[in-house]
């Protein structure tokens, strides 16, 4: 469930049997519907609502948020839509695009700055230079995708630093090959600013993923990535924390 100002209006029956809400903006509407339905509407909320958990029938929250309760279902990482079928379909659709790249092929998922991380032009240059060095030293090809959050100056810096590298770079023009890159990759490198991207990379299951750290990790993302910094029960997620350069 989401909310849109253009769709605002009075709440009226018939009331749904179930509401699945996500994010804090949807909570007020979901709880209002539950009250008006005299409790006949159940609410499943995705993510930590950051309020009293008792009004919800179920809260699905990632382990690194650190919340507990009888109505809390703990997830490892974030919920996402990555499935083997989706990856295989996307890979089949896009398989000719990176066909000129050498193998092994590395998918590189680039996020962007947020309230806790900085991914500016200088950071983009550093990451891309390390990627170019990795590609040249291992003979690998790079399938690079940026996101809507990637600053244009960082995109330009990444393109410039990878100009002579065996790389295919998508930066917002045309159809997004994100899931195809995940499906076609032999390895995955993802910037550590987004729990969603890291979770999606880890969920591919077949290949080892590497998290490229950025500056100023907040507490909850530190908690999210901490189990992957050393061997342990997260090994089945096939992700590892890169503590230094992107060396083979």
Where does each model-flagged region fall?
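Active-site and donor-binding regions of nucleotide-sugar-utilizing enzymes
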Residues: 1-74, 80
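Short, acidic/turn-prone active-site loops that include or flank metal/cofactor-
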Residues: 47-51, 64-66, 78-80, 169-175, ...
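A nucleotide-sugar donor-handling region in carbohydrate enzymes
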Residues: 53-120, 243-247
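Leloir-type glycosyltransferase catalytic cores
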Residues: 226-248
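Catalytic donor nucleotide-activated moiety binding site of glycosyltransferases and closely related
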Residues: 140-174
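Conserved catalytic-core segment of nucleotide-activated headgroup transferases in glycan assembly
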Residues: 104, 113-145, 151
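Short, charged/polar "capping" segments at the starts of alpha-helices
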Residues: 52-53, 116-117, 150-155, 217-220
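A donor-sugar binding/catalytic signature common to diverse glycosyltransferases
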Residues: 178-221
């Amino acid at each position: 469930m989401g909310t849109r100002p253009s769709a605002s209006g009075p709440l009226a029956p018939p009331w749904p049997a179930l509401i699945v809400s996500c994010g804090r903006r949807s909570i007020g509407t979901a709880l209002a519907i539950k009250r008006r339905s005299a409790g006949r509407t159940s609410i499943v909320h995705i993510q930590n609502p950051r309020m009293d958990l008792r009004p919800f029938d179920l809260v699905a929250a990632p382990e690194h948020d650190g919340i507990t309760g009888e109505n809390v279902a703990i997830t490892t990482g974030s919920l996402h839509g990555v499935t083997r079928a989706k990856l295989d379909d996307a890979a089949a659709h896009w398989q000719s695009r990176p066909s000129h790249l050498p193998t092994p092929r590395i998918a590189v998922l680039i996020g962007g700055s947020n309230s806790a991380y900085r991914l500016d032009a200088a950071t983009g240059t550093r990451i891309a230079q390390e990627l170019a060095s990795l590609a040249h030293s291992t003979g690998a090809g790079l399938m690079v995708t940026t996101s809507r959050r990637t600053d244009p100056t960082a995109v330009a810096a990444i393109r410039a630093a990878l100009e002579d590298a065996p790389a295919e770079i998508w930066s917002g023009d045309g159809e997004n090959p994100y899931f195809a890159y995940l499906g076609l990759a032999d390895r995955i490198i993802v910037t550590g600013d987004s729990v969603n991207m890291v979770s999606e990379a880890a969920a591919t299951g077949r290949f080892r993923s590497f998290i490229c750290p950025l500056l100023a990790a907040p507490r909850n993302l530190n908690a999210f990535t901490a189990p992957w910094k050393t061997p342990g029960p997260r090994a089945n997620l096939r992700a590892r924390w890169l503590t230094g350069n992107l060396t083979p």
